[in-house]
Amino acid sequence: MAKKSKIVKDQKQRELVLKYSKLRLELKKKADYAGLSQIPAKASPVRLKNRDSIDGRPRGYIRKFGISRINFRQLAHQGKLPGVRKTSW
């Protein structure tokens, strides 16, 4: 599990990206790069790091579910992920 501070930092950064998303889009359409430079750099969605929504793990992230491979496996075995079935071949 990641440190609580990392999880909180990630949540705050995601809120910041949402807050400035409309403004960034408008400034990009106008090609107002001077205005874009006035927005905080952390408000750019490119700077987001994918982290597990449950425990904040930064590696082994599965985008479709928003969780790490470890939590994916646990939840899949418990049957808590709809549409996920164990396969064998």
Curated annotation (Swiss-Prot):
<dbReference type="GO" id="GO:0015935">
    <property type="term" value="C:small ribosomal subunit"/>
</dbReference>
<dbReference type="GO" id="GO:0006412">
    <property type="term" value="P:translation"/>
</dbReference>
<dbReference type="InterPro" id="IPR001209">
    <property type="entry name" value="Ribosomal_uS14"/>
</dbReference>
<keyword id="KW-0694">RNA-binding</keyword>
<keyword id="KW-0699">rRNA-binding</keyword>
<comment type="similarity">
    <text>Belongs to the universal ribosomal protein uS14 family.</text>
</comment>
<dbReference type="GO" id="GO:0005737">
    <property type="term" value="C:cytoplasm"/>
</dbReference>
<dbReference type="GO" id="GO:0003735">
    <property type="term" value="F:structural constituent of ribosome"/>
</dbReference>
<dbReference type="Pfam" id="PF00253">
    <property type="entry name" value="Ribosomal_S14"/>
</dbReference>
<keyword id="KW-0687">Ribonucleoprotein</keyword>
<keyword id="KW-0689">Ribosomal protein</keyword>
<dbReference type="InterPro" id="IPR043140">
    <property type="entry name" value="Ribosomal_uS14_sf"/>
</dbReference>
<comment type="subunit">
    <text>Part of the 30S ribosomal subunit. Contacts proteins S3 and S10.</text>
</comment>
<dbReference type="InterPro" id="IPR023036">
    <property type="entry name" value="Ribosomal_uS14_bac/plastid"/>
</dbReference>
<protein>
    <recommendedName>
        <fullName>Small ribosomal subunit protein uS14</fullName>
    </recommendedName>
</protein>
<dbReference type="GO" id="GO:0019843">
    <property type="term" value="F:rRNA binding"/>
</dbReference>
<comment type="function">
    <text>Binds 16S rRNA, required for the assembly of 30S particles and may also be responsible for determining the conformation of the 16S rRNA at the A site.</text>
</comment>
